[in-house]
């Protein structure tokens, strides 16, 4: 599985950042260009039925090498990197045999990956670790997943003694902006179940996600010359501040963990005449999720009542739901991944995803899809890193899962 590092380093040098602002599919042209490159690579290693559609979805098949019928499994990763930080001119560095100390990412800018802030890195002391130069994210989310899947497929092709059923491979665009499954053709993909490789540290096995929605709050103010504004002006900036303060101050990402939900204010655009607030709403419990959506709408209603006119409009849109509901119907999909990890000396860590994956949506589209570790940490930022061994073990895990399904 040594090729996984070389592949990964090649992939992250291609800028595939997705965009929240774009209405195109995919949201950036670079994703489609990357999709075409991956399609060519899949053909080159020997996969069949390789396709890259106009929306940037890549699909391919590794044909079964056994006579009996077993479930067709899929492995999926996403091609885009987060819009949260630049993915242009990524300049990775390999820290060999990490010594357990702080890592200086950028001496000129004094950007340091500190162990007191990111203590999880100490788990990888003695290993080779890929880090950034402090100017960009790394792109392990999710190009590590892509590298691991392709490396595993090539390994299976080169080792026909390892028995497996039919395997489907899929790479999606725009996962980071919540659109990864929008145009995913489940029927064309042809798998009975699948796994995304989009998780964090080694051992992570995830079959629970948030229920997720987004909310846009539009506030219409009224601007009047401040010298004659009494009883006439409605300052949308101050109304926006009132709205923000009417939501629970402790139910935010930085003050919640585990199974706790939150309201997350993503952005504020405001001036006297108009203001716009963009939130995401998250909760694992479906009932609490529905209550949160009503709660944010109720804030708008109360402000409108206070001003005795409709100055606040709250629009809420569901994004995805907790995939546990669907995965529990085919529990063996998690059990096999658990057993595969044990078989290659990885201790499974069953954790809820405080986020979402393409698998969240796909599970409700008829393709149960839990999430496996890809190996990285600190996604979406300049402190992102991935241990090389974790990527190698993820590729090995894909092979072992395929083998276990063949032996069912």
Swiss-Prot record:
Catalyzed reactions: Release of the N-terminal residue from a tripeptide
Residues noted as binding Zn(2+) 2 in the record, renumbered to the chain: 141, 176, 380
Subcellular location: Cytoplasm
Binding site for Zn(2+) 1: 78, 141, 198
EC number: 3.4.11.4
Source organism of the structure: Clostridium botulinum (strain 657 / Type Ba4)
Superkingdom of origin: Bacteria
Matches recorded under Pfam families: M20_dimer (PF07687), Peptidase_M20 (PF01546)
Any GO molecular function: metallopeptidase activity
Family, similarity comment: Belongs to the peptidase M20B family.
GO cellular component entries: cytosol
Cofactor descriptive note: Binds 2 Zn(2+) ions per subunit.
Biological role: Cleaves the N-terminal amino acid of tripeptides.
Cofactor(s) this protein requires: Zn(2+)
Active site: 80, 175 (proton acceptor)
Gene3D superfamilies in the record: 3.30.70.360, Zn peptidases (3.40.630.10)
Protein name: Peptidase T
Main localization (coarse): cytoplasm
Single GO biological process annotation from the record: proteolysis
Keyword list, A-Z: Aminopeptidase, Cytoplasm, Hydrolase, Metal-binding, Metalloprotease, Protease, Zinc
Gene that this sequence comes from: pepT
């Amino acid at each position: 599985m040594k090729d996984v590092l070389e592949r990964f380093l090649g992939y992250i040098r291609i800028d595939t950042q997705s965009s929240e602002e774009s209405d195109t599919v995919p949201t950036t042209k670079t994703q489609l260009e990357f999709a075409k490159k991956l399609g060519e690579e899949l053909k080159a290693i020997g996969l069949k039925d390789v396709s890259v559609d106009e929306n940037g979805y890549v699909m391919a098949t590794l044909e079964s090498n056994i006579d009996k019928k077993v479930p067709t499994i899929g492995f999926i990763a996403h091609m885009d990197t987060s819009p949260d930080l630049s993915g242009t001119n990524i300049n990775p560095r390999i820290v060999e045999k990490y010594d357990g100390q702080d890592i200086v990412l950028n001496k000129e800018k004094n950007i340091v990956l500190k162990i007191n802030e990111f203590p999880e890195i100490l788990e990888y002391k003695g290993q080779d670790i890929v880090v950034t130069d402090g100017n960009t994210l790394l792109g392990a989310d999710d190009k590590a997943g892509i590298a691991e899947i392709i490396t595993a497929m090539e390994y299976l092709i080169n080792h026909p003694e390892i028995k497996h059923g039919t395997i489907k491979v899929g790479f999606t665009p725009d996962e980071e902006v919540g659109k990864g499954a929008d145009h995913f053709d489940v029927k064309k993909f042809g798998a009975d179940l699948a796994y995304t490789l989009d998780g964090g540290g080694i051992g992570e096995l995830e079959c629970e996600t948030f229920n997720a929605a987004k909310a846009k709050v539009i506030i219409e103010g009224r601007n009047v010359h401040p010298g004659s504004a009494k009883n006439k002006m409605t300052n949308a900036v101050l109304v926006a501040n009132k709205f923000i303060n009417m939501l629970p101050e402790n139910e935010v990402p930085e003050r919640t963990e585990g199974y706790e939900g939150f309201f997350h204010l993503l952005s504020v655009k405001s001036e006297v005449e108009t203001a716009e607030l963009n939130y995401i709403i998250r909760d694992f419990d479906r009932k609490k999720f529905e209550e949160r959506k009503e709660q944010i709408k109720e804030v708008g209603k109360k402000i409108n009542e206070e001003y005795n006119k409709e100055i606040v409009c709250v629009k809420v849109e569901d994004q995805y739901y907790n995939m546990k509901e669907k995965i529990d119907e085919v529990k063996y999909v998690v059990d096999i991944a658990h057993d595969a990890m044990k078989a290659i000396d990885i201790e499974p860590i069953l954790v809820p995803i405080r986020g979402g994956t393409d698998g969240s949506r796909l599970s409700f589209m008829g393709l149960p899809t839990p999430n496996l570790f890809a190996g990285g940490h600190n996604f979406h930022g300049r402190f992102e890193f991935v241990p090389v061994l974790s990527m190698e073990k993820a590729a090995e895990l894909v092979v072992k899962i395929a083998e276990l399904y063949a032996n069912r």
